[in-house]
């Protein structure tokens, strides 16, 4: 048991995770080519978050099941299109910006970039958007 505890104490995610994230990028795990006719296409969509702040547990409550489906379908040989987007046309983002005395566009764009990074860090297997 002491040996196992020692190994757990040595785990440093800031050292280990970036290495694997780079490897998975190299392997193209986020790549979707809907023109590839050698694999059947599978489309997956879930609710898009409001870009009004940081991601929180509610986002993962919605994203985790669809992320698992996307991974499973990829393992089955499907070409999975699982886009990530943002519901930036509502009042939550605008109200959050006004509360902070920031222009809503500036606030929304900054939060969308931050959320994209958070999704990547948490290894959500979404397809890159046309902007990425």
Language model features: what each stretch is:
Residues 33-102:
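N-terminal catalytic cores of NTP/NDP-binding nucleotidyl/phosphoryl-transfer enzymes
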Residues 13-16, 58-65, 111:
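Hydrophobic (often cysteine-bearing) scaffold residues that line and stabilize catalytic clefts
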Residues 99-106, 127:
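Short, polar/flexible loop-turn hinges at active-site or ligand-entry regions and domain interfaces
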Residues 8-45, 79-83, 112-113:
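Conserved oxyanion/phosphate-binding beta-strand-loop segments in alpha/beta enzyme cores
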Residues 125-132:
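Conserved small/polar residues in nucleotide/adenosyl-binding loops
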Residues 1-5:
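Basic/polar N-terminal segments that are highly enriched at the extreme N-terminus
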């Amino acid at each position: 048991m002491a040996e196992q505890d020692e190994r757990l104490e040595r785990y440093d995610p800031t050292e280990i995770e970036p290495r694997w994230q780079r490897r998975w990028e190299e392997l193209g795990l986020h790549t979707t080519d809907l023109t590839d006719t050698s694999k059947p296409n599978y489309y997956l969509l879930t609710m898009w978050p409001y870009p009004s702040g940081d991601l929180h547990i509610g986002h993962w409550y919605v994203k985790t099941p669809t992320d698992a489906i996307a991974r499973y379908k990829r393992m089955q040989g499907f070409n999975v299109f699982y886009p990530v987007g943002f519901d930036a046309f509502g009042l939550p983002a605008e109200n959050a910006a006004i509360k902070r005395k920031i222009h809503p566009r500036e606030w929304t764009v900054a939060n969308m970039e931050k959320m994209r990074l958070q999704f990547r860090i948490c290894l959500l297997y979404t397809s890159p958007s046309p902007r990425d």
